Amino acid sequence: MRSRLAVLLCLVSAIPATSVDRKQNWTHLVRIGGNSLRMDRVDQIVRVATETNVFGIEVDNDIPGRYDSFLDPAEKLKAIKAVAAKAHAVKNFAFVYIAGLECITANADKTTHSFMKDHPDWVQRKITGEPAVFGGGSAFWISKGDEDVWISPYAPEWRRIYMERVRQIAATGIDGVYVDIPYWMTHFEGWENTWASFDDYTVEAFRRETKLDARKDIKLGDFKDPGFRRWVDFRIATLTAFMREIDANVKSVNRNCMTIAEIYPGIEEEAVRVGADVYEMYGVVDAIAHEYNLASGGGTAAAKTPLDWWGHLAGIQSFRSFAQGKPTWMLTYSWDGEKGVDLRDAMANMFMAQVMAGANLWDARGHVMSGSNDLPTRTRTFGWIKDHAQTFYAPRNPIAPVGVYFSPRTRNYFAEEFIDSYKGTLALLMQSHIEFQVVTPATLQSFAGPVLILPEVKCLSPEEIESIRSYAAVGRALVATGETGRYDERGETRGANPIHQLLGLKRSDLKVTGTTGTKFIYDPECPGRAYWHLLTEEFDSRAATGNAAGSRFDEFRNRHVSELMQVSSFSPAVEVSASPFVAALIARVEGKPSVFLANFKGLRSKEIATQLPEQNIKISFQGKPGSRIRILPFLGKVRDLKPDYTSGKVVCVIPELDKGAVVWVE
């Protein structure tokens, strides 16, 4: 192997988890359609993309993921070069799919040579020694008679050949290399709890890094064990370093070629199990395509409940924060045969929610990457987004947000407790139409909003503690819940909790508020988690009828927002009055305070995909006489709203909102 883990970790740590501000490029504006690539399909691919307003053409002939072309890529390289040239001729861009750590040998049951037959030592393994090799039916993309293997990223000769193939692909002139499934094998049946891989190469790399034998010295699956936590960190760092090396090889031959990772785990526990953490990976690639379906709830758009949509938005807003100016692509699925739902409505809901959240769209058929459920719907929607691209994809800057802290280490070691608290906190703010910003270790020091919420942030480093101390010292308010601060960044229990010391707490079992000196709320019961649990019990049935009055979640939400405002003396810069079934995402876009609205009222999983209209939404901006308020409804045209001026504010009312809209003042 050309580089050892210690070197790889140094390379990763030298790159910040977030990128510096950069000029936008084609990856920020994509409207994606996918295609299977053969030389005889090149003209058709580019023609259909042009006709349906696709910008950013995905093509798939997977050189390293098919054993024959892994060995001899010549013919497939010609097709990649041809489609790149055709795309450029019509002022479009193309990127090509390659597998990360998976390789399929076609008809392996009838051939002398296959990946596994030739290189059994390159394959990932369970701790029992069982290899990660599968046959037809293990996944929908594996045909009968085929052999599917999952490879150790530490297999030196495989990695050498793989990076050579990456350079050859980038040298064709293609605009992007799109890497799918850079995963440890933990997502097929029977492998979910393996915490693979325990192949010789990986075990030796871990031993060099930690002096621990992964087969003997760790308690597999036990997060109380320091050795297992090091194994968790090692697995994440390994895949991040793998993607960084791919990007370095891409750029070494084509500096304008982008590296994109496709990742299905989002903010939840799956990221830890699979080892592909988008928080870390955004720092080493140019974009991430999130196949964020089941993790965010519901699977397809047609199957999502109203609460699933809020989980989806929580994920996307987290991704947008992790990206730090890089684009967020959403490879999610709209409709896969749900008979009770019109596929066009399902597509519209997915496109609306994601564009309002600032993510780039990918239109696909069913649950595959290519095709479309309805080309006319794609054409119309993509054309509308093309006409309003700056409205949705210009940088969104904060105005006066409440911060919600995402702690990668807490998620890694205490996923269940943290994620419920985190998502519940985001949902409470979104459903109260309060501007928020996801804050991370990379952005904590620069965060200047009036309130910072630490939702069950169990693990904090000394550097994070010091940044929080500095934040509170200038009069800003803190909200600390649950066991925030109990553990250090390695997951070790502290003798004394520095957050409790900062807040001057005498006891940790009582709720305390402070309005003099340090302004804070300390709540050991964690309201974010409590709110999320209330939502799971009540929200969908209430959303179906559009009536939140008298619900426990609505009473809880109003009470906690009032308490937050009182302790922090916080007054929103933009005020939105609407039901909790409407999301309001607030930001400054090209200097204009803007509100991106998404309505989920009336939706029912697999039954109803047309919303109940939200009526008489009131929005108040800071402004003066002469200010102009404009609205762009989803798939509609820009028009003016009647403004009212009062006490330094300009106010408008939206009589009716069907799906979504963006409103701004200028």
Question: Where in the sequence are the language-model features?
Answer:
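Bacterial N-terminal signal peptides
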Residues: A6-A14
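Catalytic domains of carbohydrate-active enzymes, especially glycoside hydrolases
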Residues: M39-G65, A171-G176, D286-I288, M350-A357, ...
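Acidic/aromatic-lined carbohydrate-recognition and catalytic surfaces
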Residues: E51-T172, W184-H187
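Polysaccharide-binding and catalytic clefts of secreted carbohydrate-active enzymes
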Residues: T128-L313, S318
